[in-house]
From Swiss-Prot:
A Pfam family assignment: BNR_4
Signal peptide: 1-31
Class in the EC hierarchy, top level: lyase
PROSITE patterns: PROKAR_LIPOPROTEIN
Binding site for Zn(2+): 208, 264, 266, 278
Species assigned in the record: Pseudoalteromonas sp. (strain PLSV)
InterPro entries named among the record's database cross-references: Sialidase_sf
Designated name of the protein: Ulvan Lyase-PL25
GO molecular function, one term: lyase activity
Family indicated by similarity: Belongs to the polysaccharide lyase 25 family.
Reported effect, residue 123 to N: Loss of catalytic activity
GO cellular component: plasma membrane
Keywords: Cell membrane, Lipoprotein, Lyase, Membrane, Metal-binding, Palmitate, Signal, Zinc
Record-listed substrate binding positions: 60, 122, 125, 143, 204, 208, 246, 278
């Protein structure tokens, strides 16, 4: 709920009374300070609604690639994010009662407890799934595994261990247990439940020089089959580098899973552009689909593919767009009402940084005959933007996109009615001064009130977390929030 909006609309006198009382409290410092120190006291009448539901995010608490970070089910939106020690934290919001629960810690990440390295690794953010029995699953904690896990048969290792936690009771986020049933050699988890209840967990099987794989469960995630490679890493013979990939997998129509991806040229140390060695250099956009009923993979024209797909096969059969000298950062993929794929890809000019330079969100789509598009969602914009999109008929596309305007972080809707050739800004959902936003992909089965998670990045700790919808952020009582926030260990 939005308290200010509600009081203004339904009870102007109530709103004025609340405002007057707040001013009085500001003058009566001793009395009000005493009341605020007793958050559980019924005497506390100065509680207020805030736009964030938690304030303990760390590092980059959210990303589009680890998805879904939230799910709507039975009138409740369940959300997840990276909290203290890079552990997975889970909260929920009941849309009927207006009540929040949590956040609760769902597991213990090895990434936040490693020796050396940078302060936050950020690769083990939680991914969520709810099985057919109502148990909530969280996949988290890996950046490819480490040498202590043994030899990675499908790549190399780095840090952490990919883990799988499940709620102890259906639809209950308060207690969790780890299930030791997925490989520790994983990162960038993406979880998909098919209509028949089968679960597919997609991820990269290790650090940069590793295959992309999936593991399948037919018993609500209690056991998983061995990893199956679908994108192949291999050493190049023409340059000092290894073929690598970044993928985004989502549910398509019926029994199909759709996958978009970009290519990472993983340079050896001292090689590459200007001898920069290993950078995040990535290029091009690809697409293919997986029929889970037949087990067959195919390109957009229905041509069958043999797994694992190599760079040569990808270039010949699955290419959606060449990006030339632009460096890329992959986004999401969705189907329109005609079953044609659309892809979000972030691309920008290499400006010599380790990451190349800022990348802007662009839209690519298959029109039934060829891949078209590639223009920016935000015209003339040169800084960093990220967004996820909804598409109905091929011409109507809506992006919920974050960008910066001066020093402000902005999250707003951008609308196209011509298949992505032109986008126009519609309305702003969230705006914060002197900040930047990290966002999730769209919440699975989202309702208009709660569509995306947002992290307000002012520093790298104590980050405020928002659940936003068409009308802005879902609010929470500040007293309730302070009472609910856990202490990290």
């Amino acid at each position: 709920m939005n308290l200010n909006k509600t009081l203004r609309k339904n009870s102007p006198s109530g709103y004025k009374a609340l405002l007057t009382f707040s001013i009085i409290c500001g003058l009566m410092a001793t009395g009000c300070a005493h009341q605020e120190s007793l958050p559980n006291s019924t005497a506390n009448s100065v509680d207020r609604q805030v736009g964030y539901f938690a304030d303990n995010g760390v590092g980059n608490p959210l990303a589009i690639v680890q998805h879904p970070a939230g799910i709507h089910k039975n009138g409740i939106t369940y959300v997840s994010y990276q909290g203290p020690k890079e552990d997975p934290y889970i909260a929920s919001y009941n849309h009927q009662t207006g009540q929040w629960q949590g956040p609760f810690r769902a597991g213990i990440s090895e990434l936040g407890r490693r020796d050396g390295g940078k302060k936050f690794d950020n690769h083990g953010k939680p991914t969520m799934l709810i099985d057919d029995e109502g148990y909530i699953h969280i996949f988290y904690g890996g950046h490819g595994g480490q040498a202590s896990n043994g030899k990675n048969p499908l790549g190399n290792t780095h840090h952490g261990a990919n883990k799988h936690a499940v709620s102890k009771r259906p639809y209950d986020i308060s207690q969790w247990e780890d299930l030791n049933n997925i490989t520790p050699f994983g990162t960038y988890n993406q979880a998909i439940k098919m209509d028949n209840g089968d679960i597919y967990l997609f991820f990269r099987h290790g650090a940069h020089r590793s295959d992309w794989v999936y593991q399948k469960s037919v018993d609500n995630g209690r056991t998983f089959a061995s990893p199956v490679s679908f994108l192949k890493h291999k050493r190049r013979t023409d340059i000092d580098a290894v073929d690598s990939w970044y993928a985004w997998a989502g549910k398509g129509q019926g029994d199909n899973i759709i996958v978009s991806y970009d290519y990472h040229v993983c340079w050896d140390g001292g090689a590459g552009v200007n001898g920069r060695g290993h950078t995040t250099e990535r290029h091009d956009v690809y697409f293919m689909s997986f029929n889970t009923k037949t087990g067959e993979w195919s390109n957009v024209e229905g041509e069958k593919l043999v797994l694992p797909v190599t760079r040569e096969v990808a270039d010949e059969k699955t290419m959606a767009m060449r990006t030339g000298e632009l460096w890329t950062f992959n986004g999401s993929t969705h189907l329109d009402a005609q079953g044609q794929p659309h892809i979000a890809i972030n691309a920008g000019i290499d400006k010599g940084a380790k990451t190349g330079g800022p990348k802007q969100t662009r839209h690519v789509r298959w029109n039934g005959n060829e891949w078209v598009g590639g223009d920016k969602v935000i015209p003339q914009y040169e800084r960093v933007s990220r967004g996820d999109f909804m598409v109905t008929d091929p011409e109507n596309i809506r992006y919920l996109t974050t960008y910066n305007q001066d020093n402000d972080a902005v999250l707003s809707w951008w609308q196209s009615h011509d298949g992505g050739e032109h986008f126009v800004e519609d309305k702003t959902v969230l705006r914060k001064d002197n900040a930047s936003f990290a966002i999730s992909a769209f919440i699975k089965d989202a309702i208009p009130d709660a569509q995306m998670l947002v992290a307000e990045k002012v520093s790298d700790e104590g980050i405020k977390m928002y659940l936003v919808g068409e009308e802005g952020a879902v609010t929470r009582s500040l007293v309730d929030l302070k009472t609910a926030m856990p202490t990290s260990k």
